């Protein structure tokens, strides 16, 4: 089954990433290589900064667009991974090994279809 692993960040995680970028990316590269070899890696991408985001909602058939950053948000989605593995426990294990789980945190979501 496929699972979406959402990566969260905040101002503190940005500072840590700026400081330890090479070490963190080396961990990511190693884990991605392992998941590729096992056939569990599907895809993943980092996302732009919150000031590049837009929220779109339709009210009375009219799109209402709000530019980021969103004041009410203390954290934001910084990226995602898609893995294809046997169970939610395995997906959770993968998320727990991802460096971002120690920083802003991660969520594991089953994908439908």
Name what the model sees in each region.
Residues 1-113:
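Conserved, structured core segments of small domains
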């Amino acid at each position: 089954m496929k699972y979406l692993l959402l990566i969260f960040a905040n101002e503190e995680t940005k500072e840590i990433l700026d400081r330890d970028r090479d070490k963190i990316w080396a961990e990511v590269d190693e884990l991605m290589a392992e998941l590729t070899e096992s056939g569990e890696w599907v895809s993943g991408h980092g996302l732009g900064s919150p000031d590049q985001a837009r929220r779109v909602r339709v009210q009375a058939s009219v799109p209402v667009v709000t530019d980021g950053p969103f004041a009410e948000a203390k954290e934001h989605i910084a990226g995602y991974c898609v893995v294809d593995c046997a169970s939610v426990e395995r997906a959770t294990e993968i998320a727990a090994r991802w460096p971002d789980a120690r920083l802003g945190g991660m969520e594991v979501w089953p994908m439908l279809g």
